[in-house]
Amino acid sequence: MTVIRLTRIGRKKKPFYRVVVTDSRKRRDGGWIESIGYYNPLSEPKDIKIDKERLNYWKSVGAKMSERVEKLSQKA
């Protein structure tokens, strides 16, 4: 199953997340199909960018979003 979720990048104690499309059986930071945005929780205000066109495409072909990505996509 294809899912849209966050992968963590950045340093220790300095998280930065990439919004990616991946297979649900992959590890959190394993390979991904496409990167469609990013999320920086440490910046003020929190920096969120998600490509809505690609998000809608992946949802139309059956990808499921994680709870966190659903909340972030409403804010972006």
Curated annotation (Swiss-Prot):
UniProt keywords, alphabetically: Ribonucleoprotein, Ribosomal protein
Cited Gene3D superfamilies: 3.30.1320.10
PROSITE patterns the UniProt entry points to: RIBOSOMAL_S16
GO cellular component labels: cytoplasm; small ribosomal subunit
BP terms from Gene Ontology: translation
Highest taxon in the source lineage: Bacteria
Annotated GO MF terms: structural constituent of ribosome
Similarity comment text for this entry: Belongs to the bacterial ribosomal protein bS16 family.
Stored HAMAP family: Ribosomal_bS16 (MF_00385)
Protein name (Swiss-Prot/TrEMBL): Small ribosomal subunit protein bS16
Species for this entry: Helicobacter pylori (strain HPAG1)
